[in-house]
Amino acid sequence: MYSLQLFATEIPAMKITISKISPDFKTIVMGLFEDNETVNDGGVLQGKQVIDNIKQFSDFNGSFGEFFSTALPEEKNVIVVGLGKKDEWNENKELNIGGKIYCELSRLKIKKAAVLIEGSAANVAYGAFLRSFKFDKYKTKKDEKITEVEEITVLVKDEQLSNAERSFEHLRQEGESIFLARSFITEPPNILYPESYADHIKKELTKLGLEIEVLDKKQMEEKKMGALLGVAQGSSKEPKLVVIKWNGASKEQKPIAFVGKGITFDTGGVSLKPSRGMESMKYDMAGSATVVGVMHALAGRKAKVNAIGVVALAENAVGGNAQRPSDVVTSMSGQTIEVLNTDAEGRLILADALWYTQDRFSPKFMIDLATLTGAIVVALGNNEYAGLFSNNDELANRLIDAGNEVNEKLWRFPMNETYDKIIDSPIADVQNIAPAGSGGDSIMAAQFLQRFVNETCWAHLDIAGTAWHEKGTDICPRGAVGFGVRLLNKLVEKYYEAND
C-alpha cells in the first residue's frame, strides 16, 4: 500500500523575497553589462569601489554569466555577475542569470545574499527559484559537500517594490506548478503508478478548486477503450483515466483541452526495450505531468478560461497476459488497430484519451503531450526543440509563438495523406507503426493520433527530447524539466482567456 505522504511536493526550503534597496546585507550580488564601467548600485552599495577593484584585480568584462568577487569595507562581500551585451538582455536571460546566481552562491557556500539587478527583479528571483528545485527525499544522509542556499533577497527601488512583489508572486505560483510536474516525473515507479498517481492528482488539485474525476478499469471497459486497456493488460497495476476540470469562464464558453500520456513505467512490453537506459522509462509519464502542472497553474492564477485536462495512466509491463505483437484491438472510436510493436504504446493510450476528450467535451482545441518517439530526438537532438504536429495553422503558430516567448521552443513537422496511407493495416483499420524502412517515425506516430481526431483543432507535442535534461540548465537541475507548463500557461494567457 502506498502512502500519500511520500508524495509531498518538493517546494524548496529556500526563501526568496523582494525588498527595497538597503546596504544591510553581508553578501550582495550586482550585475554589470559587457564593456560597461558603471555598476548599478542603487546609490548605496559602493559601486565605484567595485569597478576599481575589478580593474585592479581582474580581467572581468561582463560577459554573460561571468562572476567576480571582491571584498569591501565593513566586511561586505560583493559578487559581480556579467549580464552580457545590453542590447541582447531579455526576460529569458533575466531568468538564466537568476539561476546562475543561485548556483554561484551554492558553489561559494553562501547561505544568504541580496541581489540587485535593476528592472529585472521578478524574473531574476524566478530564475533562482526554478533552479533551486531538489528531489532528495529518499536520501537518508545529507551530502555535506553541498551547501544549501537558504535565502535570497532581490532588491528594488522603493517605487518598484509593489509591482515587483506582485509579478514575482505570479511567477512563483507558476513555478510551484512546474515543481509539481518535476516531482511527479522524478518519483520511482514503485511509488508512482496509475492508482497512486491518480489519487495524488486528486489530492493536490482539489486544493485549488479543480474538479477531478477518475475512471477505473471497469468504466473504461464500459466505454470500450480497448487501445488503452490493451497496453495495461500485462501489468498488475490497473489503468486510470483522470479528468481535470477548471471552470474559469462562463458556461457558454467552449473549453480548451490538454491530453497527456501517462505511462508510469515502460518496459516496452513483449517488444522489450534494451536493459541499458530502461531506468529512464519512469519519465514516460512526463506528458501527463505537464498537463497536471498546467491545470494547476491555470487554477492557481484563476485563469478566465474553461479548461479540461485528461491524463491516461497505465504501466506497460511484461507478463503472461501482456499484449502481443500482431494483436488487434478495438479503440473507443470503433476503429481497429493492429499492434505490431508493443513498445509503440503511448499512441495507443492517447488514441482513446483523445477520442474520449473530443467526444465528451467538444473542446475549442486539443493539445496532447507525450514522450512519444525516440525519432524526435534523432531529428531535433536533445533539449533544444520539441516536435509539433497539428491540423490547424493558427493553433500551431500560436504554440510556436508562446514557446519562443518562454524559451520552450517547438519545431513543426509536416503531415499529409501520403504519410497517412503508410500506416494502413492489411487486416485492421490502422497499424500502430509504419512498415520497416518507411522512416519518419515521429510523423507516423502523429498521423496515427490524427486518426482519432475528427474535425477538432488539434496539436501534438512530442516532448521525448525535452522532458528531462541529463546535465541541467540555468533554471533546472539535472533531471525532470517540467517542459510545457510555462509554454501552455503562456498560450492560454496570451490567446484564450476571456476579456474583462
From Swiss-Prot:
Entries under CDD domains matching the protein: Peptidase_M17 (cd00433)
GO molecular function, one term: metalloaminopeptidase activity
InterPro entries reported for this sequence: Leucine_aapep/pepB, Macro_dom-like, Peptidase_M17_C, Peptidase_M17_leu_NH2_pept, Peptidase_M17_N
UniProt-annotated binding residues for Mn(2+) 1: 266, 343, 345
Amino-acid positions noted as binding Mn(2+) 2 in the UniProt annotation, renumbered to this chain: 261, 266, 284, 345
Signal sequence residues: none
A GO BP annotation: proteolysis
Enzyme Commission code: 3.4.11.1, 3.4.11.10
Catalytic activity: Release of an N-terminal amino acid, Xaa-|-Yaa-, in which Xaa is preferably Leu, but may be other amino acids including Pro although not Arg or Lys, and Yaa may be Pro. Amino acid amides and methyl esters are also readily hydrolyzed, but rates on arylamides are exceedingly low; Release of an N-terminal amino acid, preferentially leucine, but not glutamic or aspartic acids
Domain of life, source organism: Bacteria
Cofactor binding: number and manner: Binds 2 manganese ions per subunit.
Needed cofactors: Mn(2+)
GO cellular component: cytoplasm
Protein family: Belongs to the peptidase M17 family.
NCBIfam families assigned to the protein according to its UniProt record, in alphabetical order: PRK00913.1-2, PRK00913.1-4, PRK00913.2-2, PRK00913.2-4, PRK00913.3-5
Its job: Presumably involved in the processing and regular turnover of intracellular proteins. Catalyzes the removal of unsubstituted N-terminal amino acids from various peptides.
Name of the molecule in the record: Probable cytosol aminopeptidase
Organism: Wolbachia pipientis wMel
Gene name in the database record: pepA
